[in-house]
């Protein structure tokens, strides 16, 4: 049934007025603090992430900061270079402008600020004014417009110097190492060119720090003639003007010889018609804000956070590079392990869901990037994994695929929320060709889960690990390491593992497949997968618990011909079952759109079977919460694989059936009561990743305490879905008030401390931004 909405002229005028105001980037100055002057290549914060927030846009591979005071005014400090998979600063000052009149340096006052899509500096003196606006013109080149107003001749001087010091944490040096000493092959060299200069870089293949091709360059081109002098790692460029002048400068980070060659024509075109590129950037950002800021019910504070989210997601957008042939979005451009074009499926589903509303083309591209490496029949590395989506793709392939990358990961995949994300893109764009493009990929992904991760064949997949050198011997025996005292021994085989567990003569076990299974859930080292600190386990045992409660078991998954496919944890996860419930529903929707009624019917039946199983088997009536279920040797009389794993405590997986709509109303009522209990999840910042009563809870533990915005949002939407919107709004208000830095100019964080609200994890974090945008765009609208 279609409902026609008739708007009165007054209503239309109000909406148009709101939209026009919202789309004006000038209304959102300094939403994120972009000032800074790095003194080290790795200028880290307390958690080893780059501690400044450079401006990136248009998928670029370099970023700029605003000056932090008189010493850096006139330039855009800390050129941040994305060296394939890592962010590293190149300079503190580079191409910093000073102005001289009658042989004296002009003493300016500085106003510097960011707006969505640009960095702006205004330098003011009695007889001279300079206005500088920096925007991105292409995915490899930024463009600076410098307007100089003066009635007298001026001498212009630009200078810069490459960084020498290697590393610091919170501004304090970690060592006295130099960049040249640590990376002798880096061989940074400044050279003058016809219209500017360039920095060339030698080839470095430091797997975990710095990756360069030996062909990369940072180029500076100017629209007026300059004379450049170079002294080692320093340069000075000079020009003379007779009065008021507007000049243009391009900055390009080019990672390969092919990019260097290809971009030159673009640079010439940018300098030939700079106004076109500046206007295009401005209009592009106006369009993002116009599309993205459509909630007239949101408070100014909520809207400002939404703008911060839009800036964050667009800043983490990377254009194609290396093995990733599509535009993509990374978790955090400033994150130690999340930069370059490193792309995860779990992050992608959420990023694309949000970006569909303001940057739908990149939302599509991000999803395409993930599926571009979906395993096809006859794959040379893992032919047994047809339909599988790798956990992490990046610039460099793994050694198994002919590259030298260390981050590329095929040990696991991520939860199946792909169809949820694809459908949101369709709901926004109404693009049926998009559904037709993605449907067969999603079906293959869905089928992989049931073929390679459903050990007991009951349609409820488990989390697990692929067949991989990290998990098993060449003959297919699962690897594990036994630790006792100061000794450790690596063994293999499930039978050996069972004997070791039964004897109990160990302090701890390290099992790569267990780690991969937790990664596969998207909740690394969560309590439900048997992760607990030694002190916590000792306390648990002292209080009457058993160590074996936290011991996980595994099963080999094999094809009909006996081929090892991989491993499953011998437990069925309630969150993955709930995601698969949604997956079936969305596949049914897509099948209907594409005129495939029989397939739609089959997926709806699968969804109902999952819902019945979740409510019959995974809800514990005693503790009134959902849990994972152990897979016993034989199913229980009620058809369940086993009993709920109550002893590992409550976690956000327990509200996944609510978010996905699989819960019964009665069970949802009970779960919400737990969520609202101050002794469980209703903490200073609510809905953390373990309840206060969980034996493995720690406020600072990554997935056993900290509040992650995705799980928080899943909880709110689940509550809303089952009639608890008012309670959910109170939790949302608490989050906004207590999550530190959120409504100020700090970056959006990876997670937050549930007891103090302290910022934790990586800054400029995409999926946090995505869910904060969703709160603004959907949840904070009046019903």
From Swiss-Prot:
<feature type="region of interest" description="N-terminal domain">
    <location>
        <begin position="24"/>
        <end position="254"/>
    </location>
</feature>
<dbReference type="InterPro" id="IPR048450">
    <property type="entry name" value="YgjK_N"/>
</dbReference>
<dbReference type="Pfam" id="PF22422">
    <property type="entry name" value="MGH1-like_GH"/>
</dbReference>
<feature type="binding site">
    <location>
        <position position="462"/>
    </location>
    <ligand>
        <name>Ca(2+)</name>
    </ligand>
</feature>
<dbReference type="GO" id="GO:0015926">
    <property type="term" value="F:glucosidase activity"/>
</dbReference>
<dbReference type="GO" id="GO:0004555">
    <property type="term" value="F:alpha,alpha-trehalase activity"/>
</dbReference>
<dbReference type="GO" id="GO:1902687">
    <property type="term" value="C:glucosidase complex"/>
</dbReference>
<dbReference type="InterPro" id="IPR008928">
    <property type="entry name" value="6-hairpin_glycosidase_sf"/>
</dbReference>
<feature type="region of interest" description="A domain">
    <location>
        <begin position="300"/>
        <end position="783"/>
    </location>
</feature>
<feature type="binding site">
    <location>
        <position position="458"/>
    </location>
    <ligand>
        <name>Ca(2+)</name>
    </ligand>
</feature>
<feature type="region of interest" description="Linker">
    <location>
        <begin position="254"/>
        <end position="299"/>
    </location>
</feature>
<feature type="binding site">
    <location>
        <position position="456"/>
    </location>
    <ligand>
        <name>Ca(2+)</name>
    </ligand>
</feature>
<dbReference type="GO" id="GO:0009313">
    <property type="term" value="P:oligosaccharide catabolic process"/>
</dbReference>
<feature type="binding site">
    <location>
        <position position="572"/>
    </location>
    <ligand>
        <name>Ca(2+)</name>
    </ligand>
</feature>
<dbReference type="GO" id="GO:0046872">
    <property type="term" value="F:metal ion binding"/>
</dbReference>
<keyword id="KW-0326">Glycosidase</keyword>
<comment type="function">
    <text>Glucoside hydrolase that cleaves the alpha-1,3-glucosidic linkage in nigerose. Has very low activity towards maltooligosaccharides, soluble starch, nigerotriose, kojibiose and trehalose.</text>
</comment>
<feature type="active site" description="Proton donor">
    <location>
        <position position="524"/>
    </location>
</feature>
<keyword id="KW-0378">Hydrolase</keyword>
<feature type="binding site">
    <location>
        <position position="454"/>
    </location>
    <ligand>
        <name>Ca(2+)</name>
    </ligand>
</feature>
<keyword id="KW-0479">Metal-binding</keyword>
<comment type="similarity">
    <text>Belongs to the glycosyl hydrolase 63 family.</text>
</comment>
<keyword id="KW-0106">Calcium</keyword>
<protein>
    <recommendedName>
        <fullName>Glucosidase YgjK</fullName>
        <ecNumber>3.2.1.-</ecNumber>
    </recommendedName>
</protein>
<feature type="active site" description="Proton acceptor">
    <location>
        <position position="750"/>
    </location>
</feature>
<dbReference type="Pfam" id="PF21152">
    <property type="entry name" value="YgjK_N"/>
</dbReference>
<dbReference type="InterPro" id="IPR054491">
    <property type="entry name" value="MGH1-like_GH"/>
</dbReference>
<dbReference type="InterPro" id="IPR001661">
    <property type="entry name" value="Glyco_hydro_37"/>
</dbReference>
<dbReference type="InterPro" id="IPR012341">
    <property type="entry name" value="6hp_glycosidase-like_sf"/>
</dbReference>
<keyword id="KW-0732">Signal</keyword>
<dbReference type="GO" id="GO:0005993">
    <property type="term" value="P:trehalose catabolic process"/>
</dbReference>
<feature type="binding site">
    <location>
        <position position="460"/>
    </location>
    <ligand>
        <name>Ca(2+)</name>
    </ligand>
</feature>
<dbReference type="GO" id="GO:0006974">
    <property type="term" value="P:DNA damage response"/>
</dbReference>
<feature type="signal peptide">
    <location>
        <begin position="1"/>
        <end position="22"/>
    </location>
</feature>
